[in-house]
């Protein structure tokens, strides 16, 4: 087959004209682009030169003139750059022209194919029409292409110009002022301040912070950073400013703490100095007392020595008399059993000597005893002892004391007790002690002189037994007055010692309160740490399960808690339970007490009744309605009678308290509160109104606290049960993966959970019981107080109703009306039927059973006891003032 010659490409004149126009347009466009770029570069260079001239303060053109050492090299470099740019542009233009030529060749092929031999006139007409359309559309498409190319070139030129500007902008030297302030001799930069220097010197820290902020502001003022970088620099500047402010606040707080510390130190030093001075004075007093006692012991020793000498002399005289008469044996027997009339002269002598020898240790015992025996007590003791069989010496001494107090001279001893009432502490410690010592010495000298006279008098044989008794009674009168004087001084010393003991007890109580607070804070930290661990455990358990082996290791490492740790937690939980202590008793005077009924405020006259379960044991701090200070009910107020102020004591047995349970809905409490808040309409005294208002507000707050405790208890219970269920699931997974040996730790963990649950739930139960007791006492106080207000002051307040914890089955309506009693003392509901009145009791019992069922359910089952629904026809005030949904909200709040 003969090969056909390829068709020759024939370019029409119109196409050639279009190509020429395109080339001319491209040349003009390239020239314009080059001129615009050169002008932009020149403008940018001028702008940079002007900016640096403004900032640096000198002209760059002068430096350029001085630095024009090699202008030819610079011109050559610029020329080479221009030639390279022109060559790049020429290559790009050649490439573009080649693409256009190829595109035009394709168009020529299509046009030659279309211009081929025409078959018919219709095809020729269609072809002509297509050519006309192409002639119209082609310039438009070329124009659109030109515009697109122009927009692309403009966009690329802006990007290229920005890049060129960034590359052409010379690197700016920042922080010249900071560098100028730094010493030029040191090669390194200035070192920043250490944290200790910042805390010590506030002025230096402020200057350094201002320097850093000014440096960051200089960065912000420059235009060489992008928006993101500027935002980051601004963030750093704000952080530095905030740190500076925080340090300033810390400085202020440190100064305030230093001033407080100095003030407390001064107070402590003053207190210690005063205590030291007081202790020194007290020691001086004790030393003076010791010296006085030592002196008294010396005097008594000398007297005892004299008495021994007198005893020997008397024995010698007695032996001499016995030898003279020759009847020594008979006289000895008679003197032991019953003295005869011949020996009555010698016996009083021995009796007086023995009496005085025994009175001295008795006086010593009285001096060192805390409270001396009264004269009447000594008379009774002397009478009782003299009646029995005792030795001769003791009988004689007691009989003489009885004779002394039985005589008429005892009337002179009774007024001595009167000055004991005036017990005031002396301002100076030395004067009373010196006076007391002087009086002691004088009294002892008088007493010893009189004792010596008495002994000499009894040694003589001229007086009878009656005269000797009279002399001894007169000589004993003044020592008793001395004893009373000493007793007065001893009472003063005892009172001073009691005062110091009270102060020491007070300091011990304050120290114990501080220790209790520290222990409570430690327990709170421990509870927070345990709660944080529980939250971390829950988060870890919510994460996707890992492989069995890794899961067992994680359980051993995270879930397992040693038994010792749980024992510590048990102790902490037991310590968190409120128990009566000395700190609580000390704080009871400062805590606001709940109002109590008049029966609890007034004790009985005989025996004080024991504390019942209704009385408060622990009184939490509660919010109250602001009222004026109350007046005591025991003091009469002007304008009121005493009969209205004194309330009769209400004696309630524990059996009656257990049987009666009072209830009052929130609507009635709100009505009472509204009625009591209206002062103008009520004519109650202020103390009665404040007491009733306090009872009402306390009852409402206790209801809210009961609901809060119940919700907290239930939340804690559900959390522990969910944690327990998760542990059980882990145990099952380990059993399935045949890793049961690793489940032992989880079993220990489950035991610890059960132990902790029992402890915490018991603590919450105790709190709930305490609130219930307070609530019952408030309601019983209302039942006691409100009817009396209604009777005496005509104030009609809603009274709590009496409900039975174990109500009997409701009888039919045909029952006799005598079995139906009113629910309150003065509150009656005659419009309700008997059957309908028994329904709330059944509902209350059913709701209590349902709550017990809720607490006894397991998490896995989540089933509740099925009970009979509450009929919808009952009003809400019969259902304790609230609907039956949800079951948890069974409290009247």
Swiss-Prot record:
UniProt keyword list: Coiled coil
A cellular component annotation (GO) from this entry: protein-containing complex
Domain of life per record: Eukaryota
Segments forming a coiled coil: 303-331
Signal sequence, start to end: none
Biased composition, class Polar residues, residue ranges: 179-188, 197-207
Region (Disordered): 177-207, 327-376, 537-557, 574-611, 806-827
InterPro entries reported for this sequence: FAM186A_B_C, FAM186A_B_N
Regions of compositional bias (Basic and acidic residues) in chain numbering: 342-353
UniProt similarity note: Belongs to the FAM186 family.
Protein name: Protein FAM186B
Protein's organism: Homo sapiens (Human)
Underlying gene: FAM186B
């Amino acid at each position: 087959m003969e090969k056909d010659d390829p068709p020759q490409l024939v370019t029409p004149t119109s196409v050639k004209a279009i190509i020429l126009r395109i080339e001319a347009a491209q040349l003009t466009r390239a020239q314009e682009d080059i001129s615009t770029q050169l002008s932009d570069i020149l403008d940018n260079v001028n702008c940079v030169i002007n900016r640096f001239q403004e900032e640096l303060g000198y002209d760059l053109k002068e430096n350029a003139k001085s630095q024009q050492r090699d202008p030819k090299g610079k011109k050559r470099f610029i020329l080479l750059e221009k030639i390279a740019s022109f060559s790049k542009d020429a290559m790009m233009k050649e490439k573009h022209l080649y693409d256009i030529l190829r595109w035009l060749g394709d168009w020529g092929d299509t046009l030659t194919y279309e211009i081929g031999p025409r078959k018919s006139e219709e095809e020729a007409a269609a072809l002509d029409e297509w050519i006309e359309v192409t002639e119209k559309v082609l310039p438009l498409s070329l124009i659109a292409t030109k515009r697109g190319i122009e927009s692309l070139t403009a966009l690329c030129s802006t990007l290229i110009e920005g890049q060129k500007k960034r590359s052409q902008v010379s690197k700016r030297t920042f922080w010249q002022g900071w560098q100028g302030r730094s010493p030029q001799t040191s090669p390194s930069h200035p070192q920043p301040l250490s944290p200790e220097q910042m805390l010590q010197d506030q002025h230096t820290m402020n200057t350094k912070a201002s320097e850093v902020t000014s440096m960051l502001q200089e960065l912000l003022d420059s235009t060489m950073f992008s928006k993101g970088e500027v935002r980051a620099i601004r963030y750093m500047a704000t952080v530095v400013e905030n740190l500076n402010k925080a340090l300033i606040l810390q400085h202020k707080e440190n100064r305030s703490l230093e001033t407080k510390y100095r003030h407390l130190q001064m107070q402590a030093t003053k207190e210690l100095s005063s205590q030291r001075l007081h202790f020194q004075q007290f020691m001086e007093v004790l030393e003076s007392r010791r010296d006085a006692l030592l002196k008294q012991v010396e005097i008594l020793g000398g007297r005892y020595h004299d008495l021994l000498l007198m005893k020997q002399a008397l024995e010698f005289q007695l032996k001499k008399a016995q030898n003279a008469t020759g009847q020594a044996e008979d006289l000895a027997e008679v003197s032991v059993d019953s003295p005869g009339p011949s020996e009555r002269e010698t016996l009083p002598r021995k009796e007086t000597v023995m009496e005085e020898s025994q009175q001295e240790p008795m006086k010593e015992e009285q001096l060192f005893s805390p409270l001396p025996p009264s004269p009447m007590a000594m008379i009774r003791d002397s009478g009782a002892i003299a009646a029995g069989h005792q030795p001769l010496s003791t009988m004689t001494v007691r009989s003489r004391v009885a004779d002394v107090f039985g005589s008429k001279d005892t009337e002179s001893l009774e007024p001595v007790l009167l000055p004991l009432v005036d017990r005031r502490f002396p301002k100076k410690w030395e004067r009373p002690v010196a006076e007391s010592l002087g009086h002691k010495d004088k009294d002892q000298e008088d007493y010893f002189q009189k004792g010596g006279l008495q002994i000499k008098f009894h040694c003589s044989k001229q007086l009878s037994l009656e005269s000797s008794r009279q002399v001894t009674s007169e000589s004993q009168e003044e020592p008793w007055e001395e004893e009373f004087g000493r007793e007065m001084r001893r009472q003063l010393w005892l009172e001073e010692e009691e005062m110091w003991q009270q102060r020491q007890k007070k300091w011990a109580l304050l120290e114990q309160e501080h220790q209790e607070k520290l222990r409570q804070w430690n327990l709170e930290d421990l509870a927070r740490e345990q709660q944080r661990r529980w939250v971390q455990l829950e988060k870890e358990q919510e994460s996707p399960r890992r492989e069995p082996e890794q899961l067992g290791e994680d359980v051993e490492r995270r879930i397992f808690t040693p038994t010792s740790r749980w024992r510590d937690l048990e102790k902490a939980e037991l310590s968190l339970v409120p128990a009566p202590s000395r700190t609580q008793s000390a704080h009871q005077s400062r805590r606001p007490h709940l109002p109590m009924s008049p029966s609890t405020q007034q004790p009985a006259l005989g025996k004080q009744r024991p504390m019942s379960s209704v009385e408060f044991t622990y009184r939490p701090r509660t919010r109250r309605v602001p009222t004026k200070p109350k007046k005591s009910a025991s003091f009469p107020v002007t304008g009121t009678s005493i009969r209205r102020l004194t309330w009769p004591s209400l004696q309630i047995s524990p059996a009656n308290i257990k049987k009666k349970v009072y209830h009052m809905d929130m609507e009635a409490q709100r009505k009472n509160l509204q009625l009591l808040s209206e002062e103008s309409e009520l004519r109650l005294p202020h103390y009665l109104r404040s007491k009733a208002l306090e009872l009402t507000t306390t009852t409402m707050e206790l209801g809210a606290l009961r609901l809060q405790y119940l919700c907290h208890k239930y939340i804690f219970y559900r959390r522990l049960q969910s944690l327990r269920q998760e542990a059980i699931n882990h145990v099952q997974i380990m059993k399935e993966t045949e890793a049961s040996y690793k489940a032992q730790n989880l079993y220990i963990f489950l035991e610890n959970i059960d132990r902790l649950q029992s402890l915490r739930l018991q603590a919450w139960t105790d709190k709930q019981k305490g609130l219930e007791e307070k609530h019952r006492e408030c309601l019983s106080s209302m039942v006691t107080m409100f009817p009396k207000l209604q009777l005496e002051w005509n104030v009609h307040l809603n009274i709590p109703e009496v409900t039975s914890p174990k109500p009997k089955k409701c009888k039919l309506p045909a029952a006799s009306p005598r079995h139906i009693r009113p629910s309150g003392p003065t509150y009656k509901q005659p419009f309700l039927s008997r059957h309908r009145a028994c329904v709330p009791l059944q509902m209350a019992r059913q709701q209590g059973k349902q709550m017990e069922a809720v607490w006894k359910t397991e998490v896995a089952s989540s089933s509740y006891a099925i009970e009979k629904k509450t009929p919808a026809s009952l009003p809400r005030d019969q259902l304790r003032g609230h609907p039956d949904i949800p079951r948890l909200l069974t409290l009247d709040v």
